[in-house]
Regions:
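Residues in the recognition helix of alpha-helical DNA-binding motifs
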Residues: 63
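Short alpha-helical segments that sit at the start of domains
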Residues: 3-33
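Short, cationic-aromatic polyanion-contact patches
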Residues: 21-26, 45, 78-91
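A short alpha-helical element within helix-turn-helix/winged-helix DNA-binding domains
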Residues: 42-54, 67
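Short helix-capping/hinge SLiMs at alpha-helix to coil transitions
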Residues: 36-41
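A short, conserved structural fragment
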Residues: 68-78
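Short coil turns linking two alpha-helices in DNA-binding domains
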Residues: 56-59
Length: 91
């Protein structure tokens, strides 16, 4: 039980450091997917997030827009495919 408490406290501190405390679980999952994709693949686009998350296109777009307005994520149009947008973490 003590280990679980320590892990939850660590997670809370990470979310505080990343300014994610005020977001719901869906929004946090989308943020973590972006971070994971960038860390493992070097790139992440909106389609990657939709495919990986299982959330609707609308939910992903609304959340990314929310992150963009909060300066958590930068959205850049892909040079290779003008219909696609690449995501960059602002932190």
């Amino acid at each position: 039980f003590k280990n679980l408490t320590s892990i939850l406290e660590m997670l809370w501190n990470i979310e505080k450091d990343l300014n994610l405390v005020s977001y719901n679980e869906t929004e946090k999952k989308i943020y973590y997917i972006i971070a994971w994709k960038l860390s493992n693949c070097g790139t992440c686009n909106i389609s990657d997030v939709i495919d990986s998350s299982g959330f609707s296109r609308s939910t992903v777009y609304k959340t990314i827009k929310k992150f963009e307005l909060a300066d958590l994520v930068i959205v850049k149009q892909s040079e290779g495919d003008k219909r696609e947008f690449n995501l960059i973490l602002a932190n």
